[in-house]
Amino acid sequence: MKIRPLHDRVIVKRKEAESKSAGGIVLTGSAAGKSTRGTVTAVGNGRILDNGSIKPLDVKVGETVIFNEGYGAKIEKIDNEELLILTESDILAIVEE
């Protein structure tokens, strides 16, 4: 199944959380928490402005992003993969490696 986000929505596949603490302790289960990083798998056409024009999104497919866990993230299971549906404003940064 293919999913296509609308407007300023972005589909993100969450990356695995770090399994070691800063001190080198191996974390398991809920102690590891959920990552707030992911890879963009699809983007909408853009945000509709007040004048009716469309502003393209700044994020692109394939980019790694850091997102805000608590703001508007919707979790869906598509083909046994957990995907997040976020608005572009839920994304805090693009990771450049």
UniProtKB/Swiss-Prot annotation:
A Pfam family that the UniProt record links to this protein: Cpn10
Query: Which SMART domains has this protein been placed in?
Result: Cpn10
Task: For this entry, list what GO says about its biological process.
Answer: chaperone cofactor-dependent protein refolding
Q: Does the keyword Chaperone apply?
A: yes
The protein's location, in the record's own words, is: Cytoplasm
What's the domain of life for this entry? Bacteria
Gene Ontology CC annotation, any one: cytoplasm
Q: How does it assemble?
A: Heptamer of 7 subunits arranged in a ring. Interacts with the chaperonin GroEL.
The entry assigns this protein to a family as follows: Belongs to the GroES chaperonin family.
Q: Which NCBIfam families match?
A: PRK00364.1-1 (NF001526), PRK00364.1-2 (NF001527), PRK00364.2-2 (NF001531)
Name of the protein this chain belongs to:
Co-chaperonin GroES
Q: Which organism is it from?
A: Buchnera aphidicola subsp. Geoica urticularia
Q: Which gene encodes it?
A: groES
